[in-house]
Regions:
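Domain-level signal for Mg2+-assisted phosphodiester chemistry and nucleotide/NA-binding surfaces
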Residues: 1-85, 109, 114
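Short acidic, S/G/P-rich loop/turn micro-motifs used as interaction or catalytic elements
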Residues: 14-18, 101, 143
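Short, glycine/polar-rich helix-capping loops at beta-to-alpha or helix-loop-helix junctions
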Residues: 46-51, 120-128
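Short, well-ordered beta-strand core segments
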Residues: 61, 92, 135-136
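Short beta->alpha connector loops at strand-helix junctions that form conserved
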Residues: 63-65, 119, 138-140
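A glycine-rich beta-strand to alpha-helix segment
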Residues: 84-126
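Structural recognition of alpha->loop->beta junctions
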Residues: 125-146
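N-terminal regulatory modules in eukaryotic regulatory proteins
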Residues: 147-167
């Protein structure tokens, strides 16, 4: 690893809560000093609804227009391999609470990178931390009203619906 490691942060924004994203960015910044690439993968609706968070944390939203099962995971995986080849990072951090990324993690490790995982405590399966070189689980601060990006999007849609008047 070089004196200042090159670090990529790739976020499955459909799978982790906004407060976990904030905690991860804060911790990684404290550990490495800089995160060279910060990207969040998710739906167009989530990108728009969370643009303030992404802007504040300097996270580039990567809009996934496909709607099929695991389409966000696939978009993240394809981009991750492109970035590993082009950017030659020392560390790749994947923020997701699911274990779908096992083949991706193995391939990135083969390219010589340390692969860290970040997830939400209570959502992470038993096997998920074993996939990564290192894995950190963050508490979901539900008391503050933090939710997953999908949940927050659903709430925003419901809030925009016309109110019903009761007699």
């Amino acid at each position: 690893m070089s004196a200042t490691p090159r670090v990529l942060l790739l976020i499955d924004a459909d799978n982790v809560s906004t407060d976990v994203i904030e905690q991860a960015v804060s911790r990684l910044h404290a550990e490495y000093g800089a995160l060279h690439v910060r990207r969040a993968y998710g739906t167009a609706e989530n990108a728009v609804k969370h643009q303030r968070l992404f802007k504040r944390l300097s996270i580039r939203p990567m809009v996934n227009l496909a709607t099929g099962k695991n389409s966000t995971d696939i978009a993240l995986a394809v981009d991750a391999l492109d970035l590993v080849i082009a950017e030659h990072p020392d560390v790749v951090v994947i923020a997701s609470s699911d274990s779908d990324f096992a083949p991706l993690v193995a391939r990135i490790r083969e390219k010589g990178c340390l692969v860290r995982g970040v997830g939400q405590k209570g959502k992470v399966g038993e096997e998920t931390p074993l996939i990564y070189d290192e894995f950190v689980e963050f508490e979901h601060r539900a008391a503050r009203g933090a939710r997953t990006l999908k949940d927050a999007a659903s709430d925003a849609d419901a809030a925009q619906a016309p109110a019903r008047k009761t007699p």
